[in-house]
A protein has these predicted regions:
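Flavin (primarily FAD) cofactor-binding/catalytic cores of flavoenzymes
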Residues: 1-57, 111-643, 647, 652-654, ...
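Redox-cofactor-proximal catalytic regions of oxidoreductases
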Residues: 47-110, 597
Length: 680
C-alpha cells in the first residue's frame, strides 16, 4: 500500500499567510516524529510582501504605524497553544540590516532607510515589504526536516472536494494557469483586500461618467493606480479624506518631483509644475486626525479600566440569548474610558499628578449618568472650554456657519494646525491624543465583545458598522502628523483645495454648454460649487462577498461552498453582513447549508463582520490576536494531515448555527497545548 503524501495549501502569502507559515513550521517542529507534509503557497505576488506591500512601490507611500510596533513573529506576550519562536520586529530587523548583519546585496535606498529608521518612525511600505520578504525566506529556509514548500505565482480560481481522492473530503485547488493541486489535507484562505464589483448606484454613476467621456478612477489601492492619466493641470477631485487620500496626495505632489522645505519652522511646498489641480471632499469634510507622536514604546498600551475581558465575558453571558446592543452596553464603557484618560492627562499636564489619579477613581465611580460625571469634572476645576464633547470632536465645525470657500479654508487650516500641535504633544502626555489612542488600544477588547455575533444584527449594522467603525477610523487610525503638515503646505501653495462637508458630486454631460465635467459642492459652504475633469474614489474597494471580484470566492459562492455571515437580530430575521462566514476559532469555512468544512479555514479581511477591524496588523508585545489566530489555524491544519476528516474537531453538524452568530464568545475547537493529538 502506497503512503499518501500529506499536504496543506495556503492561499494568500501576505502578512497573514506568512504568519500561518511560521506557525506551521513552529508547530510541526514540536511534533514527535511527524510524517512529512508539503505546503503549497499560492499567491500571484511574491510571498511575504504579497501585493499590498510589494517592494517596487513608490517610496512616497508610508505605513501609518511606527516601526517599533510592527512584527510578524510571536513573542512572550502571545497566548499560544503552540511553541514560541520569537523573531525581530521591523525596527529590530532594520537595526540589524543597517549594521550589516545580513550581508551585502541590499539596495542603497533600503540600507539608507534602515539606518535612519527609529522605533517611532513611520517606515515606507516598500521597506516593510523587504522585511516581509526576509521573514518569508527565514521561515522557509529554516523549516524543520519533513516540512517542504512550493510557491505557485498564480491566482487560485476554484476550491472543491477532490473527487479523485480515496477520501473525498480531501481538497483540490485550481489555479489560473489550470494547474490542479489535489489530495490536499487542508486549505487555508489568508486573503487581504480583494477587488469588488460596483453596486447598482456605483454602476449607474460610472455609466453616466463614461457616457460623458469623463475619467473616473474606481476604489483601489493607490499603489496600483496609473496616475499618468492625470496630466499636469488637470482638475481632479479626490473623493474621500482618509488614508487613501493621503496616499494619492503624496503621489500627485512629491511623487511628481514637488518638494517640501522648512522655512522658519513652517513646512512649505515648492511645486514642480507637473501637479494636477487637486480638490478634495468627503461626507465629514475634514481629514482623519493625525496620530499622536508615540510615547508608549513598542509594547505600551492603555490597560482597560472598564472594558476588561472579564467584564465582556459577563456581558456576553448575560445577553447570550439576545445579543449585546453596542449603544446600550458597550459605548458607555468605551466613552467613559476615553474621557477618563483625557481628564486624567489634562490634570497631569497642569501639574496635578496626585489629583489626576484621584479624579480617575472619582470619575469611574460616578457611573454613566452625566449629572454625576459633570459634578466630578466641576469639582476638579475643569472649565467649560476644556470639557470633552464627542459630537464636537466628530464634527469640529458644528458651531460654525461658513460664509464662503475662503472662510472654510481659513477655518480648516487653523483646525489642521491645531491637530498637528496636539499630535506633537504625544499619545501619553497630550490629553487629546492620549484619549484618542485609547480607541486604538481597546480594539482587542471590542473584538471580544462584538466578534461572532456578540451584537444583535441591528446594532451591528447601525451602531458598529455605520457609526462607530467610521468614527474610530477618523479619530484613531489616521496618518502621521507629517502628512497633515504636508496637507497644510499644499493648501497654502494653491495645489490643494478642500471643498467642505456633505459634498455632492454629479455628472454634468455638458448638454447646452458643450463641456462635460463633474459638478462638486458642499451645502455647508456657500459658493463652493466647482467643476472638475476627473474623479478619483480615494478609498479601498468594499469588503463584500456578494460583489467580490475574487474568482476563488465567486466560485465558492456560486457552488454553495461558502456563504455570507448572518447575524441574528432581536426580531425574527437576521442581518446579512456580506462577510465570509466562518466558525469560531480555528475559523472553518461554512457552506450555504450552514455546515463547517473540516479541511477549509479562512481568516483576514474577507471575514470582516465575523471579526472586527480585520485589516489591523501584527503588533509585538500586546498578545496580538492575529498571532493567536494563525497559531490555532496552523495547529488545526496539521491535525488534518494526521487525522481522518470524521474525527477532526468541529467537523460535525453541531456548529451549523455559526452563520447566525450563536456560537459562544471565544469558542474554539480543542487544540491541546502539548503535541497535536486530536481531542476526543
Amino acid at each position: 500500500m502506497t503512503t499518501r503524501h500529506r499536504s496543506v495549501c495556503v492561499i494568500g502569502a501576505g502578512p497573514r499567510g506568512l504568519s500561518v507559515l511560521e506557525r506551521l513550521c513552529a508547530n510541526f517542529r514540536s511534533q514527535p516524529e511527524p510524517s512529512p507534509v508539503h505546503v503549497h503557497v499560492v499567491d500571484p505576488y511574491p510571498p511575504g510582501p504579497g501585493k499590498v506591500w510589494r517592494t517596487d512601490q513608490s517610496p512616497h507611500l508610508l505605513m501609518n504605524t511606527v516601526a517599533g510596533q510592527i512584527s510578524v513573529f510571536t513573542d512572550a506576550s502571545v497566548d499560544l497553544s503552540g511553541p514560541l519562536e520569537p523573531g525581530p520586529s521591523l525596527h529590530e530587523w532594520a537595526v540589524a540590516l543597517g549594521a550589516g548583519e545580513f550581508g551585502d546585496g541590499h539596495p542603497a535606498e533600503a540600507l539608507a532607510e534602515a539606518r535612519r529608521l527609529g522605533p517611532d518612525t513611520y517606515p515606507t511600505r516598500a521597506f516593510y515589504g523587504r522585511y516581509l520578504r526576509w521573514a518569508y525566506q527565514r521561515v522557509t529556509s529554516g523549516a524543520p526536516a519533513g516540512l517542504t514548500f512550493t510557491t505557485h505565482p498564480h491566482l487560485a480560481v476554484a476550491l472543491d472536494d477532490d473527487p479523485d481522492a480515496e477520501d473525498q473530503t480531501l481538497q483540490r485547488v485550481t489555479l489560473a494557469d489550470h494547474t490542479v493541486l489535489g489530495g490536499l489535507d487542508a486549505v487555508i484562505l489568508c486573503q487581504g483586500h480583494l477587488p469588488a464589483r460596483a453596486d447598482a448606484a456605483e454602476r449607474d454613476f460610472t455609466a453616466r461618467a463614461r457616457q460623458a467621456g469623463l475619467l473616473h478612477i474606481a476604489p483601489a489601492n493607490p499603489a496600483d493606480v496609473d496616475l499618468d492619466v492625470l496630466p499636469p493641470g488637470t482638475t481632479v477631485l479626490l473623493r474621500g479624506l482618509g488614508l487613501n487620500f493621503f496616499d494619492y496626495l503624496a503621489q500627485l505632489t512629491a511623487g511628481r518631483d514637488g518638494t517640501f522645505s522648512r522655512v522658519g519652522g513652517r513646512l512649505v511646498y515648492h511645486p514642480s509644475g507637473r501637479e494636477p489641480q487637486i480638490h478634495a471632499a468627503s461626507r465629514r469634510g475634514i481629514p482623519y486626525q493625525a496620530r499622536g507622536e508615540n510615547e508608549k514604546g513598542p509594547h505600551g498600551r492603555h490597560e482597560p479600566l472598564l472594558l476588561s475581558a472579564e467584564r465582556i465575558a459577563r456581558l456576553r453571558r448575560t445577553h447570550e440569548s439576545t445579543g449585546l446592543d453596542f449603544r446600550d452596553q458597550l459605548w458607555p464603557l468605551i466613552s467613559r474610558e476615553v474621557e477618563t484618560v483625557y481628564y486624567r492627562t489634562l490634570l497631569t499636564s497642569r501639574g496635578y499628578t496626585a489629583e489626576a489619579q484621584q479624579f480617575q477613581d472619582d470619575y469611574l465611580a460616578a457611573g454613566p449618568h452625566q449629572r454625576h460625571t459633570d459634578a466630578v469634572i466641576a469639582a476638579y476645576g475643569i472649565g467649560e472650554k476644556d470639557r470633552w464633547d464627542w459630537d464636537l470632536i466628530a464634527r469640529p465645525y458644528r458651531d460654525r456657519e461658513f460664509t464662503g470657500p475662503g472662510d472654510f479654508t481659513g477655518w480648516l487650516l487653523d483646525h489642521l494646525r491645531e491637530d498637528v500641535a496636539e499630535a506633537h504633544c504625544g499619545n501619553v502626555s497630550g490629553p487629546l491624543k492620549a484619549a484618542l489612542d485609547v480607541l486604538r488600544d481597546l480594539r482587542n477588547e471590542i473584538r471580544l465583545a462584538v466578534d461572532h455575533g456578540g451584537l444583535h444584527g441591528d446594532s451591528y449594522r447601525t451602531d458598529l458598522d455605520r457609526w462607530y467603525t467610521p468614527l474610530n477610523a477618523y479619530l484613531s487610525i489616521g496618518p502621521p502628523a507629517r502628512r497633515v503638515e504636508e496637507m497644510i503646505a499644499l493648501i497654502e501653495a494653491g495645489v490643494l483645495h478642500v471643498v467642505g462637508p456633505q459634498v455632492h458630486v454629479e455628472v454634468d454631460t455638458g448638454t447646452g454648454t458643450g463641456r462635460a465635467g463633474y459638478t462638486v459642492s458642499s451645502p455647508l459652504v456657500p459658493g463652493s460649487e466647482l467643476r472638475v475633469d476627473a474623479l478619483v474614489e480615494a478609498r479601498l474597494p468594499d469588503i463584500t462577498l456578494s460583489r467580490t471580484g475574487d474568482p476563488l470566492l465567486r466560485h465558492l459562492l456560486a457552488t454553495g461552498q461558502c456563504t455570507a455571515y448572518r447575524i441574528r437580530t432581536r426580531r425574527a430575521d437576521a442581518y446579512d453582513s456580506d462577510g465570509l462566514a466562518v466558525t469560531a476559532r480555528p475559523f472553518r469555512l461554512i457552506d450555504a447549508a450552514g455546515r463547517p468544512h473540516p479541511r477549509r479555514f479562512a481568516f483576514g479581511v474577507p471575514t470582516e463582520s465575523v471579526h472586527w477591524v480585520t485589516a489591523a496588523g501584527i503588533r509585538p508585545g500586546v498578545n496580538s490576536v492575529t498571532l493567536t489566530d494563525s497559531d490555532a489555524i496552523a495547529r488545526a491544519a496539521l491535525i488534518c494531515t494526521t487525522t481522518a476528516a470524521a474525527t477532526v474537531p468541529g467537523a460535525g453538524p453541531e456548529q451549523s448555527t455559526a452563520t447566525t452568530g450563536t456560537n459562544p464568545p471565544g469558542g474554539q475547537s480543542p487544540t491541546p497545548r502539548q503535541g497535536l493529538t486530536p481531542a476526543h
